[in-house]
Amino acid sequence: MKKVLFSPINFAVVAGLMSLVGLTACTENSQQPTSQPNTAQTSAPTEVAKAPLKELTIAFATRRDTKDLQSKVDQVSAILSKEIGIPVKAVIGDETASVEALKADRANVAFLSGRAALKADTLAGSKMYLAEVRDDYSGGKTYDSIFVVPENSPLKTLADGTQTLEQLRGKRMAFTSRSSGSGFIFPVSELVGLKFVDGPDRLEQFFGKVTYGDGYSSALQAVLRDQADVAAVSEYALLPPWITAEEGKKLRVLHAVPNVPAHGIVIDDNVPADMREKLINAFLKLNEPENSELFRSLYNSTKLVKVDHEPHLAIMRTAIERAGLKP
């Protein structure tokens, strides 16, 4: 007797199963293409192309040690424009106005201090790419914040900062201003770090009297006129034009706080990467012999050097936080 491999019923069952498998496969194959576009639609682009700039605006900071600034920045702008291939417009203003201009896209580049650069980063996404180097900066691209006393002051520089600054308890203190990095932020950070004060609102609990000037000169003049026992300024403020050479001989450094980050060139994030590189290289042209005298006449800088935003400004950020302040 022959065995029947496929009865009508068995064949029908098998055929049905095969049809079901085929239907499932077809269904899966037909679904895959529709799922891919959905994924593509929900994925955000990693980088948005920036429109080419037709003109650059650079905000140059006002400084007391610079004369005829507009004429000089116009010459610098002409050099930069030639290098990058588009017009460069120069404007002059204080740091607050410069940061606001970056935020409002009225400026693409600014020359700022460390604290202002951090604020520009927060408000506008701008970063520092170049820092100045000066002969009167002891650290090259960093400088010292200093506590200054009269040459004949009984206050002495002792074995360490704690012993030295302990002598200031009850004394009359003159800060450069409430916004100065070297003349307020770093000195207060040092005092907080050494546990003499809890923050900027507790200074009167340590000092006998606290005053704030409108710049380095006014703070130093308070000491020279015996209106204060000590002043906090930048190390380069002991030189003209802040005070005369003769006045400088009547003062001395009691204590120094190092590594205040140098001022530098901040570029906004609305500048495309290729233009940013062109601009950085154009600024570095100011270091060359034919441009160095003009560049030095701006802010007494000897050259510009490349920096990484975060490492260069990290100590400023720490000082601000420790002093209980905001950028």
Say what each PLM segment does.
Residues 27-30:
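Bacterial signal peptide processing site
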Residues 114-125, 187-193, 221-249:
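A ligand-binding cleft/hinge motif common to bilobed small-molecule-binding domains
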Residues 90-103, 115, 198-221, 259:
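Short helix-initiation/N-cap motifs at beta->coil->alpha
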Residues 42-45, 50-51, 55-58, 65-87, ...:
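Short, polar/charged alpha-helical segment
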Residues 133-184, 189-194:
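A conserved helix-loop-strand patch within extracytoplasmic ligand-binding domains
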Residues 75-84, 182-212, 242-246, 319-322:
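Ligand-binding cleft/hinge of the Venus flytrap
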Residues 57, 61-62, 130-146, 204, ...:
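Periplasmic-binding protein-like
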